[in-house]
Amino acid sequence: ENGAPVFPTGGTRVLAYPAPHYAVADGGQAGLAAGGSGDYAFVYLNLRMGKGRSEATQQRAGQTLSEVARTFFAPVMAQRHIGITLQIDVGAEVFDHKHSNIHPLFQKS
């Protein structure tokens, strides 16, 4: 906002991991009945951002990320049943400590 990046490079963290145990809907019965494999998939995207960004910026970030996710997963969705969830949380932290020497790498002189 105000010309600054919405998500500064030095503050960006990405985490991805498969769920070793999961269940989706009816175990695949409706997918099989619809001519699919019954092997459902899902992606849960959660963005946590610190306080201070306007609601318009939060909404714009959500819309942009939704479009990127839809485009990215379109080839998968064309082949199998998949659910995509994107949720954005804005920090209401009761404790928020950050210690990093990464940010200075991206500071402009």
List where the protein language model places each region:
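Short, glycine- and small/hydrophobic-rich beta-strand elements in well-ordered beta-sheets
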Residues: 5-24
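Short, low-complexity, polybasic intrinsically disordered segments
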Residues: 93-109
